[in-house]
Curated annotation (Swiss-Prot):
InterPro entries the record matches: Creatin/AminoP/Spt16_N (IPR029149), Creatinase/aminopeptidase-like (IPR036005), PepQ_N (IPR048819), Pept_M24 (IPR000994), Peptidase_M24B_aminopep-P_CS (IPR001131), X-Pro_dipept-like (IPR052433), X_Pro_dipept (IPR022846)
Name of the gene encoding the protein in the UniProt record: pepQ
GO process annotations (BP): proteolysis
Protein name: Xaa-Pro dipeptidase
Binding site for Mn(2+) 2: D244, D255, E418
Binding site for Mn(2+) 1: D255, H335, E380, E418
Cofactor note: Binds 2 manganese ions per subunit.
Gene source species: Shewanella frigidimarina (strain NCIMB 400)
Superkingdom in the source lineage: Bacteria
Length: 439
């Protein structure tokens, strides 16, 4: 942890600088950041799995403890009010002792409703940052998630500190181990459910610890973009496998996708071809490049793949203009990555919150930023046989499609290949590939 401790010192300095700057700009005394609180299931005495406020875990890697608070003004040492109740029903987390604790004045809270005792006495100029506005009301906060503050914080989420980049490297390293285990499980004949268990066992994280619900899809299920059903029964015929699965490290996410063919066939060749497209797009990433331009370039690459593999006729430009490529590749090229899988700030033009909308022809693109050093993004081109989208094409566009080849590819579902990439000033760092997930 020595390296993380060193990097964390600079990380805290940057977070304090940001808080000081936005509070001075907005005439605030500071921010009070709430980790969150449990949500009770309807008509039950059980809570939903706790998910921490991402603005809270930006400060420290406490991910599983509700009713905690960070009090920061950008000048003084931040206070961590750590919830440690007297409870014989549940495990009570120990008082933190880690590489980051020296940076906080840690105070212990035993009852959630006693938090007012730990907060500044006059909250008129302090801003509450969190989900539970009812709690903020009771405590007397006038400023609750003010737009100017949130826009500022979201915009700067794209600019990762060196501590954050190292956490994301470690998240990728963990996830790659899971992907390799899942790949072997697929070729060993496992079901979707069994592959999922193999993955989680390998990375040592549970379903509520990974950053999102894993997509483990065999055969035609790979055409369902957010498939999470996990069939227990093994398919009668094993054709293809798409896995979109991540891992967490200190609250930072990895988000990786791979697709495999059970046999060396035409679908396998299409995977190889799309992999080359993905790497070609990554090579074009550098500061100053518009992410929208990379997305549109990907559509032209995919248009050529459709022609090369006999899925469509015409030119790549025609297939893009007719919307054919959007039927085969309906989602965005990727998104910003960090504390959240779809990290905040992907549409932010500036600190003030100026919104850059996705192009009208590509409404599902999650990032419209201009690339800059220390940003982390996913690059995830895909190609799927989704009948719903193909059927919605115009008559002219349908004429460009070779339906015989589409029918042949349909049982394989689709392909997605996704890496996590750091943009540096003079290079790109493909974390996913560098940790050994090369195919």
């Amino acid at each position: 942890m020595d390296q993380l401790a060193h990097l964390y010192h600079a990380h805290m300095a940057e977070l304090n600088r940001r808080v000081g700057e936005i509070c001075q700009r907005e005439n605030l005394s500071g921010l009070v950041i709430h980790s969150g609180q449990p949500h009770r299931q309807f008509l039950d005495d059980l809570n939903y799995p706790f998910k921490v406020n991402p603005q809270f875990k930006a400060w420290l890697p406490i991910l599983d403890t509700p009713n905690c608070w960070v009090i920061a003004n950008g000048q003084d040492k931040p206070t961590l009010v750590f919830y440690r109740p007297v409870d014989f029903w549940h495990k009570v987390n120990d008082v933190p002792q880690a590489f980051w604790t020296e940076h906080f004045d840690i105070q212990l809270l035993t009852k959630p409703d006693r938090i007012a005792d730990f907060l500044p006495k006059d909250l008129a100029s302090w801003a509450y940052i969190g989900e539970h506005l009812d709690v903020a009301d009771v405590l007397g906060f006038a400023a609750r998630n003010p737009d100017a503050v949130m826009n500022y914080l979201h915009y700067h989420r794209a600019d990762k500190t060196q501590y954050e980049l190292e956490c994301m490297r470690r998240a990728n390293q963990i996830a790659v181990k899971g992907h390799l285990a899942a790949k072997n499980a697929f070729y060993d004949g496992a079901s979707e459910f069994e592959i999922q268990q193999r993955y989680l066992l390998e990375i040592g994280q549970g379903e509520n610890e990974v950053p999102y619900g894993n997509i483990v899809a065999l055969n035609q299920n790979a055409a369902i973009l957010h498939y999470t059903a996990l069939e227990h029964v093994k398919p009668a015929q094993r054709l293809s496998f798409l896995i979109d699965a991540g891992a967490s490290y200190h609250g930072y996410a990895a988000d990786i996708t791979r697709t495999y063919s059970f046999e060396k066939n035409r679908f396998y060749e299409l995977i190889v071809a799309l992999d080359k497209v993905q790497l070609a797009i990554i090579e074009q990433m550098k500061p100053g490049v518009k992410y929208v331009d990379l997305h549109i370039a990907t559509h032209h690459y995919i248009g050529q793949l459709l022609i090369d593999f006999g899925l469509a006729n015409g030119t790549a430009e025609q297939l893009v203009a007719q919307g054919v490529t959007s039927a085969f590749f309906p989602h965005g090229l990727g998104h910003m990555l960090g504390l959240q899988v779809h990290d905040m700030g992907g549409y932010s033009h500036d600190e003030r919150g100026t919104h850059i909308a996705a192009p009208e022809a590509h409404p599902f693109l999650r990032c419209t930023r201009v690339l800059a050093a220390n940003q982390v993004l996913t690059i995830e081109p895909g190609l799927y046989i989704i009948d719903t989208l193909l059927n919605q094409l115009s008559a002219t566009a349908k004429q460009a499609i070779n339906w015989t080849t589409v029918d042949e590819m349909r049982p394989f579902g689709g392909i997605r290949i996704e890496d996590n990439v750091i943009v540096h000033q003079d290079r790109v760092e493909n974390m996913t590939r560098e940790f050994g997930l090369v195919d």
